[in-house]
Amino acid sequence: MALVRWRLRRGNFHLLSRVLLLKLTVVIISVLLFCEYFIYHLVIFQCHWPEVKTLAHGDRQKPVLKAMFLADTHLLGEIRGHWLDKLRREWQMERAFQTALWWLQPEVIFILGDIFDEGKWSTTEAWADDVQRFRKIFRHGSHVQLKVVIGNHDIGFHYQMSKYRIKRFEKVFSSERLFSWKGVNFVMVNSVAMEGDGCSICSEAEAELREISRKLNCSREVQGSSQCEGEQRLPFSAPVLLQHYPLYRASDANCSGEDAAPPEERNVPFEEKYDVLSREASQKLLWWLQPRLVLSGHTHSACEVLHPGGVPEVSVPSFSWRNRNNPSFIMGSLTSKDYALSKCYLPFEDRVLATYGAAAVFLVVLILAHLERLPSSFLFGWKLRKMHMRG
């Protein structure tokens, strides 16, 4: 009789073990799917394109261009990039980017520099590997255009940059500086070359910008017809200036918001030509291009600044968890005359980690709850075995 009872309890033990294993598997898979996939849909689904005025132009309304702006992706390289850090950060950016494409369907995407973390010193082989990973993470359909601006981590600071690194970057991402679509002009500046010291790279970059300025002036019909004769006219629209370094500002003291720099860092003075462009370079860009809007990266934090002449600048926070807990990107609805911007936050890293922590606690409680139901089966079997051994 005792042996029958022991066999029943042993069968019950195996059943409880299988039930526990099934529950653990379901919980673990559910948490992984939520934290690594569904959470991106849940968060980005709540983002919406801002509305912009579409004033009638004759019998037609002005077309609206939907543009996404993100910055400082900092794909890790072979020197400073631990494999686990790479895996975690790049998966986060890939899921965020692909989910944003799915829900928001932008027409053009701009990345405002520091695409890579080690472009300034990477070897040819390491560069090729970084580019391959970039193309996988930021893959997109042919109906979407992706434009990239040079950052200091892509080619090095002014004293590190070389024509070789610039050509290597432009071979992959194009050397285009002026881009027009749906009546909206974008000027993409290599802000690393705005040192103003007369170096050959800097002189070429400034000459390019002066030529773009001339073309923009022709579209405004500022210059005489002789200077613009035979020129293919750009859309009559003040440009949007895109660059990595922000225009000159003393610090982030006037920046606010949950994704601005931490309070203890906001009053730290910025260094010209390192944290921001110099006063002189900033004045040149504003004078030459007369932009209606400036978007920049580099600081990894958000800020909105109003420059002389009423020109607004938006500093776009980093897109990567590696640089901040609450990454985001900017959504812009633009016409040739007007624009509207809104911000779309990505999942916060600490909340994802908290979800994993809560799941781990739940698993421990679940295991302990099942173990409390098992000792009687073990004890009964142990006693029965001892009785047989004595017999």
Swiss-Prot record:
One of its GO terms (biological process) is GPI anchor biosynthetic process. Binds 2 manganese ions per subunit. One of its GO terms (molecular function) is GPI-mannose ethanolamine phosphate phosphodiesterase activity. The chain crosses the membrane at residues 25-45, 352-372. It is a multi-pass membrane protein. Keywords: ER-Golgi transport, GPI-anchor biosynthesis, Hydrolase, Manganese, Membrane, Metal-binding, Transmembrane, Transmembrane helix, Transport. A divalent metal cation 2 binds at residues 72, 114, 244, 300. GO terms for cellular component: endoplasmic reticulum exit site; endoplasmic reticulum-Golgi intermediate compartment membrane; Golgi apparatus; nucleoplasm. It comes from the Eukaryota. Belongs to the metallophosphoesterase superfamily. MPPE1 family. Metallophosphoesterase that catalyzes the removal of a side-chain ethanolamine-phosphate (EtNP) from the second mannose of the GPI-anchor protein intermediate. Participates in the glycan remodeling steps of GPI-anchor maturation to allow an efficient transport of GPI-anchor proteins from the endoplasmic reticulum to the Golgi. This is Metallophosphoesterase 1. It comes from Cricetulus griseus.
